[in-house]
Structure formats: structure tokens, C-alpha cells
Amino acid sequence: MTTTSPLNDERAVSRLRVDDDIVLASMPLRDGTDRAALSRFGDDVWDMAPAMFNMARKAFRTVDFGVIPCAAERLLAKEYIYAWMNERRADGEPRLRPVSGHTALATLRRFLDFVRSRIGKLDLANVDQDLIDAYATHHRARPITPGRVGVCLRPIVQLHRLAPYLTCGGITFTPWRGRPVYRATGQGTRCSENRTARIPEPVIGAMLRWALKYVEHLCDDIF
């Protein structure tokens, strides 16, 4: 059974990774990528760009762990992002995309800060259902969509799911008894109803007629 230990600098050495582990080990890479130049687990800034095939904002091309002053928390964050990107679990959950690493770190840190503010220290062993319910309530009270609330709660589920790959042991109980995150947001369904007003039929009809006319009579020059 995985045990959870308080996060302190004595726990800042990974039981599972070595500094030379390649961060993008399981990711498809762009043609011409020099594998010798890829970011390693021991680096405090991970370059995700070699595994990005579409344009992304500069901020999302790297994951910067150097902003975390506590060495043990920095290790937890590294193991969390590394495991989510590279480890395949039997539950079939998709792995973290490199372009999402920046956001995943931000949402993790937000939850860890909440834990510290509630119990006075960062100790995942003291995280219980009441605490994560309070965290969900905190985000539901914000002026954000239910989908965004779900994103904010995702670290809770992942800290449990990835516990075997975390030196500190992660969250040992099953959050919300295994219910999907979107139900914990109070949303009730996976997708909320689209409340955008329908385009009036006379308008959409005219648009379709012009589209068909263009395809049938006016677009020879593009074929």
C-alpha cells in the first residue's frame, strides 16, 4: 500500500526518477529533433516544444519548476507532470499533452496552496474528502464555467491516480468515491446545454442557398 509523507526538503530526492530521465520519453517528436538536447528530469525548466506540432503561445512551450521555492514541492510537481505525460494506466485515461504541461502545473500549484492554507503545511496525508469538497465549493463560487471548475479540480483526481509514481505517495483515498470530476462541480452532466440562440430559419436558409450557388456555379477557379 502506498503511504503518504509530509512534504519537506528531506523528501526532495525521487525514489522513482533519476535526473537524466528524458522528459518527453513517450512523446512523438518533431522531425529533426536532437534527442541529446531534450530536457531531463533534473532540469528546472522543461522544453516541451519538440513534441508540439501546432503553434502554441511561448508561455506554453516550457514548464518552469524553478518558480517553486520548496524543493520537495518542486519534486512532487516534476513527478506529477512526468508521470501524467509518460505513464500508461489500466484505466485508459489519456496522457497529458506536452502543450498542457504549463496549465497542469498551474492548477496543481493552486490546489497545493489551498492545502497549505487550510492545514498549515503541505501534507497530502491530511487531505480528506471535506477538504476537497471545500476546494470544489471555492471554485464553484467563482465566476467561471463548470468546465473550468472541472479543470481546477483535476489535480485532486490525478494526485490519487498517479500516487504510485509520486515519492510523497499522493492522495491515498478515492476522491468523491470515484465519481467523475464533472459531477463534483455540480454540473450534473458532462456537457452543459448550448444556450446560444438559434439562427433564424430565413437567415440560415439564405446562407445555404448562396453556399450551394457558390459551389455549383462560382468556384470553378479553385478546383
Task: Please give the residue ranges for each predicted region.
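Extended, charge-enriched helical/coil interaction regions that scaffold DNA-processing
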Residues: M1-F223
